[in-house]
């Protein structure tokens, strides 16, 4: 059994007190939740502290909370902010764990079959396991997630039933524990000890939980009784503390057993017979032969190995669901009274709505042409109405709420005033002729003041050409695009703040929620090209990126002023006047937000060449205290020895060089 802690309260830690619009917004939202309001909207302008407001609401209502974000970059930023506000509670991160993902597909026009190909990020997989285990263990949990949260995850009941619970004094044979660990997909490896593995030394069993990468559990036996449970540093073996009870969660979210597997394979066989008869009656003999060959092979693998490539396509049979029933998702791991916060809801909710249709169109081709059984269609994301059925209470959060939110509720809480006194940026419209020379001049002015610049373009080609052009002029520039891996996007944002880059060029990634106070200029190229990227809502969001700096300004390069441009400028001017009046009344002088630069998510890296230095480790070294510097060097030395022990001499040599550089820097 899992001892779920339901008496833990959220502990908000902040040196700030709610000011401006925040106290009223917090009170209204809290009252709405306590009064049973199903849906509310927090209409908050950029830089007004919406995350801080929501944090106060979470503390007040004390409910497990899912914060839904529309992209991984913003999710990573929110994760860092909530961790800072709630250091004593469980703040988790749940996004797709694929660094690269090519879904299975078939293109009839060219008779091209594309096999599924993917690369899994181990760090994100760990964070996903941490999220689900926290939800089952405690009540004070905030999970920041992308739309990955509405994709299939496995039955939470099966996952919970497979948890191995261990207590000091418990009678259990050592070998029985080993069998339990293997049953929940842990792998025995006495030499390469890492997540999801265990090792055995006599009466001592060491277990590395799937949800952690720094601490392992040491279970010591005396005969057939657990004598002691210790938490140890996985790298050094140093004892961190003793535990009376531990719960070992499965190493995979997709748990099954022999009975379920037998029932599933029998069901798949029955469906295969029906589908083959259907295809043959329609004269689709090639499709029937293809389906029979592929499915028969999968069934053989499932019986012999308990697994096959693409097993997720049989998830309906594995879960015991009926045709058309929704899959289990992260939402099923939450208790029924959880709170949902949809960040940048005007983008996130349309994204949630579109997930099912896109997935269905691709899979229908696979079914029609004999690559998959019809049950594969039930391996899918949730439909919008299915997501709505999970919602207990929701707060839609946006500076520009969309039509969907307006249909759900008329309970709108406004938050326009910034506690910092910062004004919405000034907006200047300039002609397209000579825009490059003008833009470079503006960028150089910001560089002289140690400020940063965002430039947003309409196409990928334009962004790439602009990036190359600025690089040729010696400007430190980065191009933020969709091909960049999840955690690297967050790192690029951090590097911009640190001054490694002065300019960031993007298309659709420099909008909602990107929070960089050093940015004082946002340049919008082709602002008069009406469309999705240049409509009123998009322009207001883009303009908001310059609203966190007291020198914030926006330049729109356009030959005419469109209705969208005018509406965005009018709304910005309205908000600016409200803030000016508030500042005058309270004697506030606008000041740029001072925000600490921190690593949001630890990313494990490996150098491609032995001669490269671990700059990602050393980047903040000179800013550390002497004591912290020595601790970091000691830890890197441990990592170096561990890498050498695993015969990873390339990594060991790289760490050695980094350590030598650090010791030289401190004069050791």
Curated annotation (Swiss-Prot):
Q: Indicate the segments forming the Helicase C-terminal domain, all copies.
A: 435-601
Residues bound to ATP? 44-51
Q: What would be one Gene Ontology cellular-component term for the protein?
A: cytoplasm
Q: What SUPFAM superfamilies would the database entry show?
A: C-terminal UvrC-binding domain of UvrB (SSF46600), P-loop containing nucleoside triphosphate hydrolases (SSF52540)
Alphabetized SMART domains for the sequence: DEXDc, HELICc
Domain-related comment:
The beta-hairpin motif is involved in DNA binding.
Family membership noted in the UniProt record: Belongs to the UvrB family.
Q: What is this protein called?
A: UvrABC system protein B
The scientific name of the source species is Levilactobacillus brevis (strain ATCC 367 / BCRC 12310 / CIP 105137 / JCM 1170 / LMG 11437 / NCIMB 947 / NCTC 947)
| Record lineage | Bacteria, Bacillati, Bacillota, Bacilli, Lactobacillales
């Amino acid at each position: 059994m899992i001892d779920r802690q339901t008496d833990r309260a959220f502990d908000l830690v902040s040196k700030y007190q709610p000011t401006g619009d925040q106290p009223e917004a917090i009170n209204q939202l809290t009252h709405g939740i306590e009064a049973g309001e199903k849906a509310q909207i927090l209409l908050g302008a950029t830089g007004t502290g919406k995350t801080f407001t929501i944090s106060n609401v979470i503390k007040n209502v004390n409910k497990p909370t899912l914060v839904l974000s529309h992209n991984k970059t913003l999710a990573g930023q929110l994760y860092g902010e909530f961790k800072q506000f709630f250091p004593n509670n469980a703040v988790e991160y749940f996004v797709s764990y694929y660094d690269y993902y090519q879904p299975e597909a078939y293109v009839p026009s060219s008779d091209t079959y594309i096999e599924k190909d993917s690369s899994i990020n181990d760090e994100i997989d760990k964070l996903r396991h941490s999220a689900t285990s926290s939800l089952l263990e405690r009540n004070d949990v905030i999970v920041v997630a992308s739309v990955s949260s509405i994709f299939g995850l496995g039955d939470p009941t099966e996952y919970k039933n497979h948890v191995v619970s261990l207590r000091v004094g418990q009678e259990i044979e050592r070998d029985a524990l080993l069998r339990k660990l293997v049953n929940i997909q842990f792998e025995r490896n006495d030499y390469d000890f890492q997540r999801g593995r265990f090792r055995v030394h006599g009466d001592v069993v060491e277990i590395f939980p799937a949800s952690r990468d720094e601490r392992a559990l040491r279970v010591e036996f005396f005969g057939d009784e657990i004598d002691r449970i210790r938490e140890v540093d996985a790298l050094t073996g140093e004892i961190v503390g003793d535990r009376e009870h531990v719960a070992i969660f499965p190493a995979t979210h997709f748990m099954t057993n022999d009975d379920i597997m037998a029932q599933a394979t029998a069901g798949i066989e029955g469906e295969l017979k029906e589908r083959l008869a259907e295809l043959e009656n329609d004269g689709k003999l090639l499709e029937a032969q293809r389906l029979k060959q592929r499915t028969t092979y999968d069934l053989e693998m499932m019986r012999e190995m308990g697994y096959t490539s693409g097993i997720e396509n049989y998830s309906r049979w594995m879960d015991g669901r009926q045709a058309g029933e929704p899959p289990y998702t992260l939402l099923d791991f939450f208790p029924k009274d959880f709170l949902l916060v949809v960040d940048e809801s005007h983008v996130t909710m349309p994204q949630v709505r579109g997930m099912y249709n896109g997935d269905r169109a691709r899979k229908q081709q696979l079914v029609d042409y004999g690559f998959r059984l019809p049950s594969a269609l039930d391996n899918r994301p949730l439909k919008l109405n299915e997501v709505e059925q999970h919602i207990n209470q929701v707060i839609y959060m946006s500076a520009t709420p969309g039509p969907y939110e307006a249909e759900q509720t008329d309970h709108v809480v406004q938050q326009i005033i910034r506690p910092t006194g910062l004004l919405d940026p000034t907006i200047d419209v300039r002609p397209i002729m000579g825009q490059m020379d003008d833009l470079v001049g503006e960028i150089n002015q910001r560089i002289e003041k140690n400020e940063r610049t965002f430039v947003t373009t309409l196409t990928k080609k334009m962004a790439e050409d602009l990036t190359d052009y600025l690089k040729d002029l010696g400007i430190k520039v980065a191009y933020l695009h969709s091909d960049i891996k999840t955690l690297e996007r967050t790192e690029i944002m951090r590097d911009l703040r640190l001054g490694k880059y002065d300019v960031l060029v993007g298309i659709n990634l420099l909008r909602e929620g990107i929070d960089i106070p050093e940015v004082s200029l946002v340049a919008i190229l082709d602002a008069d090209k009406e469309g999705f990227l240049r409509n009123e809502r998009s322009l207001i969001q883009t303009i908001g990126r310059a609203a966190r700096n007291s020198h914030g300004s926006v330049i729109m390069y356009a030959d005419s002023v469109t209705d969208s441009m005018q509406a965005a400028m009018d709304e910005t001017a309205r908000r600016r006047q409200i803030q000016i009046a508030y500042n005058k009344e309270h004697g506030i002088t606008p000041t740029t937000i001072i925000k600490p630069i921190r690593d949001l998510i630890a990313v494990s890296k490996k150098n491609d060449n032995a001669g490269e230095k671990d700059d990602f480790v050393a980047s903040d070294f000179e800013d550390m205290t002497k004591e912290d510097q020595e601790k970091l060097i000691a830890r890197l030395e441990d990592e170096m020895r561990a890498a050498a022990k695993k015969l990873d001499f390339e990594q060991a040599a790289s760490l050695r060089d980094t350590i030598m550089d650090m010791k030289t820097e401190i004069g050791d």
